[in-house]
């Protein structure tokens, strides 16, 4: 009788643990913050400033945990670069500057954009 009671209790516990374990994993995935991606490609232009600011604003309004800037530029105006760097430094959302795709560059003023991010990364 004791053996049967033990088997029944064990089976019930196994079923309960099996049932609730997947729910716990799913709830952890739902709470993960998203990342906003902004692509800046080509020579630095004044349009980039507004585009970058919209990306920062969107990251803040959606509660994103990260803003990723995909960068591929030969550079551009020093004044514009300074403005973009100030936007990145003032961002309340962490900024990753990712030089991509393979063979992309961040030359001249683009180098300073990469250095202004919280994290700098480059495609192989």
Give the positions of each predicted feature.
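Soluble extramembrane regions of membrane proteins in the secretory/endomembrane system
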Residues: 19-124
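Bacterial N-terminal signal peptides
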Residues: 9-22
């Amino acid at each position: 009788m004791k053996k049967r009671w033990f088997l029944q209790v064990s089976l019930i516990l196994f079923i309960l643990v099996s049932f609730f374990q997947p729910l716990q994993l799913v709830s952890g995935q739902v709470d993960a913050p998203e990342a906003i991606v902004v692509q800046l490609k080509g020579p630095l232009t004044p349009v980039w400033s507004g585009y970058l600011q919209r990306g920062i604003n969107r990251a803040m309004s959606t509660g994103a945990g990260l803003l990723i800037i995909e960068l591929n530029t030969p550079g551009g105006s020093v004044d514009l670069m300074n403005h973009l760097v100030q936007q990145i430094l003032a961002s309340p959302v962490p900024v990753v500057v990712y030089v991509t795709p393979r063979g992309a560059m961040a030359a001249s003023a683009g180098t300073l954009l990469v250095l202004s991010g919280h994290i700098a990364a480059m495609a192989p």
